[in-house]
């Protein structure tokens, strides 16, 4: 998908949802399309998650999702799935979470695939966020005589694609901060050597979070104190996130794990020009979601400059003997999720 910075004057051409009453069945079909799109999570960046369901005579005959970068798009996979199952797609309705593309990229246009398959109606959750191509897919389909309806579960699709949409609109990554504390809000026990104090099940959720991010960032002090790997280890992944270490004074040791384990690390020393400039640089590298796992100093700098989009607060039930207490100003954030990771309470705040 061709991507560009969203210009304010172009937003007037934005995707507008069809005004209509959707049936319970239609909600069910689109919800299923959103669910199957999740199968591509962590495998398709910088492309978005997309799912597609084909329905004919009131029955789901096929489903597809964007599975990996360079692979079939969701619509193409759904059509292939129908063929594999022996279903005739002529006259079917496609429920797709993102406006079908109408340009040649790593794959041919999805609009052509839908036309070739004889799809008679396309229901779209969310429009293409790129103002240069937005609406072109819809226009091509409508001009070919296909009935197009838009906006079904648009907010749900937007939530699923939030990092992608944020990147398209801002050319910067969506910034998630994750911090773990003891029962009293201490981030570290200074009486002990550095080490994890959360449960194994919580760590697995952290690794799931890491897998969903393009890059992981810490400051020099975290590397010096913890010597972390900052990799995804407890769940399967095809690609490790880029590690970023902010170290303007070049303090970390040359034998640190992040510099010697064979995975990619961007070590920012005298080339560090501030957080805003760094986020611009990461946006140019197609980094769509950045996970900040640094200490209080690094986290506070991100918060003070208004650069955090999501804040994940993980609270253990243990008590540090020699606590390093910290507080974070979350003015402007809203508590969006309360959950549990293993033995830890987790609160997620979003801006």
At which residue positions do the language-model features occur?
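Proteins enriched for Cys/Gly/acidic motifs involved in redox and nucleic-acid/cofactor modification
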Residues: 43-44, 70-71, 138, 152-180, ...
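Enzymes that bind and transform nitrogen-containing heteroaromatic metabolites
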Residues: 2-6, 10, 14-48, 106, ...
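Residues embedded in well-ordered beta-strands
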Residues: 53, 93, 176-180
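Short, flexible helix/strand-to-coil boundary loops that buttress conserved ligand/catalytic motifs
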Residues: 126, 161, 191
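Zn2+-dependent cytidine deaminase-like catalytic core
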Residues: 54, 59-156, 242, 301-303
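N-terminal glycine-rich anion-binding loops that anchor highly charged ligand groups
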Residues: 44-58
């Amino acid at each position: 998908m061709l991507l560009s910075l969203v210009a304010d004057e172009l937003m007037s051409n934005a995707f507008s949802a069809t005004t209509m009453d959707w049936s319970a069945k239609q909600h069910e079909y689109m919800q299923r399309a959103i669910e199957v799109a999740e199968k591509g999570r962590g495998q398709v960046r910088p492309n978005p998650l997309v799912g597609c369901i084909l329905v004919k005579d009131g029955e789901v005959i096929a489903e597809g999702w964007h599975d990996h970068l360079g692979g079939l798009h969701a619509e193409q996979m759904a059509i292939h799935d129908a063929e594999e199952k022996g279903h005739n797609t002529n006259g079917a309705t496609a429920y797709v979470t993102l406006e079908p593309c109408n340009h040649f990229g790593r794959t041919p246009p999805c609009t052509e695939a839908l036309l070739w398959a004889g799809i008679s109606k396309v229901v779209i959750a969310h429009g293409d966020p790129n103002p240069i191509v937005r609406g072109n897919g819809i226009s091509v389909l409508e001009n070919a005589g296909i009935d197009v309806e838009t906006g079904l579960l648009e907010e749900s699709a937007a939530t699923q694609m939030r990092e992608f949409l944020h990147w398209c609109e801002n050319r910067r990554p969506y910034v998630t901060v994750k911090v773990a504390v003891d029962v009293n809000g201490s981030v570290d026990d200074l009486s002990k050597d550095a080490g994890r104090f959360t449960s194994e099940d919580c760590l697995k959720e952290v690794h799931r979070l890491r897998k969903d991010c393009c890059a992981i960032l810490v400051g020099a002090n975290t590397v010096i104190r913890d010597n972390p790997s900052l990799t995804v280890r407890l769940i399967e992944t095809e690609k490790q996130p880029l590690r970023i270490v902010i170290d303007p004074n070049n303090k970390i040791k040359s034998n640190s794990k992040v510099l010697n384990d064979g995975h990619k690390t961007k070590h920012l020393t005298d080339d560090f020009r501030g957080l805003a400039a760094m986020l611009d640089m990461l946006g140019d590298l197609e980094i769509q979601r950045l996970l900040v796992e640094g200490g209080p100093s690094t986290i506070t700098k991100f918060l003070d400059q208004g650069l955090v989009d999501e804040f994940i607060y993980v609270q253990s039930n243990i008590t540090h003997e020699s606590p390093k207490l910290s507080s974070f100003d979350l003015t402007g954030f809203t508590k969006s999720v309360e959950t549990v990771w293993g033995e830890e309470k987790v609160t997620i705040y979003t801006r």
